[in-house]
UniProtKB/Swiss-Prot annotation:
This is Acetoacetate decarboxylase. One of its GO terms (molecular function) is acetoacetate decarboxylase activity. It comes from the Bacteria. It catalyses: acetoacetate + H(+) = acetone + CO2.
Amino acid sequence: MNIDTVRANAFAMPLTSPAFPMGPYRFVKREFFVITYRTDPEALRSVVPEPLAVTQPLVHYEFIRMPDSTGFGDYTESGQVIPVEYEGVAGSYTHAMYLNDHPPIAGGRELWGFPKKLALPTLKVHTDTLVGTLDYGPIRVATGTMGYKHEEVDIVEQARHLSAPNFLLKIIPHVDCSPRICELVRYYLEDIRVYGAWSGPAALELAPHALAPVADLPVLEVVGARHFIADLTLGLGEVVYDYLAK
């Protein structure tokens, strides 16, 4: 294979069989279970990178079922998203995500900078209860529950929430382990259609784990929960801050 061919085909690894395809990345009937809780503000400030600003001591703990996603397949994800502001505009910073499918782990990390690790999340309905769990190896590190569809929620408001900017800290090391890329990335969800949204009484339990430290942002009080289903496209990102720029 000559050098020009390598350059022309260099999208992702392996060169001759990339771990994920080029987009667009469309998600159909994506199901969200989001528990919002109050946590320690100092713990939040210690993990959110400047120039993002923490404005309130809240965390959104998410369980997400993705049964139909372009190129990524059928998988489940769980993790923590933090409300922030950037240049006075409200958005969300993705702190940590855990999922059970390699292509979105590889693509998420390499393209956007999603902080994804391999684990075993689930999201199911058990009789009258919506239940989300996260296992890291044999250890249960998160359990979320909510009364199933107790109250309807405005789908226009849910679409507005989904349309807000999202932020990621993308880090790619050089071959000598020094940082080659260290960037704050902004992306948006696009072409959003919300089918339905609901709320209900909710509870969240987080357990300590050395390699899945979700409990480092402790649950002090559950302040709300949402369950909704939507179609959306995961938009490509843009670099808004380069930490290595001189």
